[in-house]
């Protein structure tokens, strides 16, 4: 069964690895070794196949089995979020007791990890395994988490599962229009791209190209040219969400990809502001727009360099955040693009440059101030 471009088994394994589990075991009902199909699904991962009658890692992990070991059991029909699996790995639980939820996910802390692995190798279904372990260790309820996992009952649940996964891709740090308009479009595109071989980096380059193509249209003072450039700018912003969505959806995140995405986005902003400045200078025959443009570009690059680490972490503000931190957060959103579209429809995109020449340096100073207050 394939869910959002990945076989469900591989998705479960990659989520477990992303959650920080040191070992991921996959139970195979195939006797006499792992099934070749499972081997292909696990290719490139650190997962090990657990077959009937075999208990891999027991000997090599001998010293570790004497200590308390956290084991999470997940049926093959449950689509997990990595953060949910991480919470199962880290939460405090009563030892030597099986904690289970309605989706047949279970967690146990035990010094007898070998017994759990042997039972997992012996029983072919999650229901049988959970029943046997509950009889041995006793049972306790594990709080159900509809946000953290999606239980599939049949192939017909594939579309709802994909919708659930896509909704989880919406970031904490998003403006109103980005969350309620752009994300709806980008997620629809990502849903169709997920089964293909299109990579996140490829989408970053497509988005970058569209944004850079749109920038020169702001050299003109004609409304139709400016509006076309603004619509390309908006298209860039929408498609800019697809690369990160694909990366998170298919576990393809990388530092290289995050850097390419972040600086590609800011390169488009610099190009748009620079072209607005040159266009206004050509229209007025004055040099001061070039100074305003230079100030905006320098502040944009400085703000990007300063804020890049926090932005890529996707951290949300706490409830007790100061008003300056909240104001800096609000300035970082890209809802300003819609103002560019409206102004461009009247041939007044240059007005936005005037606003940006004040707002962008202000944002940069706010970042410096917030950072200084946090260090104090």
Specify the residue positions occupied by each region the protein language model found:
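Alpha-helical transmembrane segments of multipass membrane proteins
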Residues: 192, 212-216, 340-345
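Conserved beta-loop-beta/alpha segment of the NTase-like Rossmann-fold superfamily
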Residues: 35-107
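Membrane-embedded alpha-helical segments that form the functional core of polytopic membrane enzymes
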Residues: 200-256
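Residue-level signal for inorganic ion chemistry
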Residues: 9, 77, 199
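A feature for the membrane-embedded catalytic helix bundles of lipid/isoprenoid biosynthetic enzymes
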Residues: 96-97, 101-187, 262-376
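N-terminal glycine-rich phosphate-binding loop and ensuing alpha1 helix
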Residues: 1-39
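Short amphipathic alpha-helical coupling elements at transmembrane boundaries
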Residues: 187-195, 244, 248, 258, ...
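Juxtamembrane helix-boundary/capping and inter-helix hinge elements in multi-pass membrane proteins
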Residues: 53-60, 250-256, 317
């Amino acid at each position: 069964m394939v869910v959002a471009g990945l076989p469900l088994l591989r998705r479960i394994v990659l989520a477990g690895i992303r959650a920080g589990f040191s070992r991921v075991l996959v139970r195979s009902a195939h006797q006499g070794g792992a099934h070749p199909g499972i081997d292909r699904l696990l290719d490139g991962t650190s997962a090990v196949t657990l077959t009937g009658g075999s208990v891999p890692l027991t000997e090599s992990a001998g010293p570790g089995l004497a200590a308390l070991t956290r084991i999470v059991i997940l049926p093959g029909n449950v689509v997990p979020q990595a953060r949910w699996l991480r919470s199962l790995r880290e939460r405090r639980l009563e030892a030597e007791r099986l904690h289970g939820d309605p989706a047949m996910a279970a967690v146990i802390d035990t010094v007898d990890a070998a017994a759990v692995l042997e039972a997992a190798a012996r029983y072919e279904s999650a229901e049988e395994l959970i029943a046997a372990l509950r009889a041995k260790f006793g049972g306790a309820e594990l709080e159900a988490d509809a946000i953290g996992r999606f239980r599939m009952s049949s192939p017909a649940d594939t579309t709802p599962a994909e919708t659930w996964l896509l909704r989880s891709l919406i970031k904490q740090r998003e403006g109103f229009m980005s969350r309620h308009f752009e994300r709806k479009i980008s997620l629809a595109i990502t849903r169709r791209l997920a089964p293909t071989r299109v990579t996140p980096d490829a989408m970053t380059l497509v988005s970058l190209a569209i944004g850079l193509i749109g920038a020169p249209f702001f050299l003109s003072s004609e409304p139709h040219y400016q509006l076309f450039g603004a619509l390309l700018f908006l298209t860039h912003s929408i498609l800019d969400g697809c690369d990160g969505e694909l990366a998170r959806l298919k576990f393809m995140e990388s530092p290289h990809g995050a850097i390419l995405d972040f600086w590609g986005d800011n390169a488009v902003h610099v190009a748009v502001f620079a072209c607005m400045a040159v266009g206004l200078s050509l229209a007025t025959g004055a040099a001061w727009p070039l100074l305003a443009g230079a100030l905006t570009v320098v502040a944009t690059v400085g703000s990007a360099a300063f804020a890049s680490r926090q932005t890529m972490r996707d951290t949300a503000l706490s409830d007790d955040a100061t008003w300056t931190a909240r104001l800096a957060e609000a300035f970082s959103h890209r809802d300003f693009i819609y103002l560019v579209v409206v102004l461009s429809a009247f041939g007044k995109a240059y007005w936005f440059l005037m606003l940006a020449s004040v707002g962008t340096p202000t944002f940069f100073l706010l970042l410096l101030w917030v950072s200084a207050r946090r260090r104090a």
